[in-house]
Amino acid sequence: MIRAIVTDIEGTTSDIRFVHNVLFPYARERLAGFVTAQQYAEPVKTILDNLRRETDAPAASTADLITTLFAFMDEDRKSTALKALQGIIWRDGYLNGDFTGHLYPDVLPALEKWKAQGIDLYVYSSGSVAAQKLLFGYSDEGDITHLFTGYFDTLVGAKREVQSYRNIAEHLGHAPGTILFLSDIHQELDAAEAAGLRTIQLVRGDRDPASHHPQVQRFDDIHPEQIPA
């Protein structure tokens, strides 16, 4: 019996184009000015200090760090410091009404159904927990954060590492086989499966021929009650 569902965001609950065509450019345009203006104020000061440790550059200037952050964006590096700064900038965008968090129309009804069935819902994304809460708090469907019991980001580990999913299972307090992980990336699902979790792959476009995981196109194609223990 599935007791908890952990879902990815990008390409799973939300269109990847929203992240890459709206969120990323919005943060990139504002990053340098924001970091320069806030470098001595919290939480930016601590984030920059963490970035110096992350890059093993204790003497790096703010200008150096900004250059590093732009390089990380170009590489799509899953840097905890970068994700934290992006999340702060996106908060202003959500609060100002510059955009709302995209949700596929099949997502909310399924989440509500699973919640009503007594299944705990969690999010695991490379974006910071703060950014996750913003997307679901200011979504196309309004604030749906009440549906989620908890959130995980790269602080629990990278999404293609088996140990990350062991950490999540330990935190949830459920046997791994009672946890279902949803993602559009088969390498993430491979890691989750190796940790003992159940897996389903969301394929919003063409099927993934390199994947052995069950593939569905919509959340309403997922029936956790039919997954054997």
Swiss-Prot record:
Enzyme class, first EC level, given as a word: hydrolase
Bound how, and how many: what does the cofactor note say?
Binds 1 Mg(2+) ion per subunit.
Q: Which InterPro entries does the protein's record reference?
A: Enolase-ppase_E1 (IPR023943), HAD-like_sf (IPR036412), HAD-SF_hydro_IA (IPR006439), HAD_sf (IPR023214)
Asked if Magnesium is a keyword of the record, the answer is: yes
Q: Which keywords appear in this protein's UniProt record, sorted alphabetically?
A: Amino-acid biosynthesis, Hydrolase, Magnesium, Metal-binding, Methionine biosynthesis
Q: Which cofactor does it need?
A: Mg(2+)
Q: Which domain of life is it from?
A: Bacteria
Region Disordered: start and end of each range? 207-229
Q: Which Pfam families does UniProt cross-reference here? A: Hydrolase (PF00702)
Compositional bias annotation for Basic and acidic residues: 218-229
Q: What does this protein do?
A: Bifunctional enzyme that catalyzes the enolization of 2,3-diketo-5-methylthiopentyl-1-phosphate (DK-MTP-1-P) into the intermediate 2-hydroxy-3-keto-5-methylthiopentenyl-1-phosphate (HK-MTPenyl-1-P), which is then dephosphorylated to form the acireductone 1,2-dihydroxy-3-keto-5-methylthiopentene (DHK-MTPene).
* Family the UniProt entry places it in: Belongs to the HAD-like hydrolase superfamily. MasA/MtnC family.
Name under which the protein is recorded: Enolase-phosphatase E1
Q: Which gene encodes it?
A: mtnC
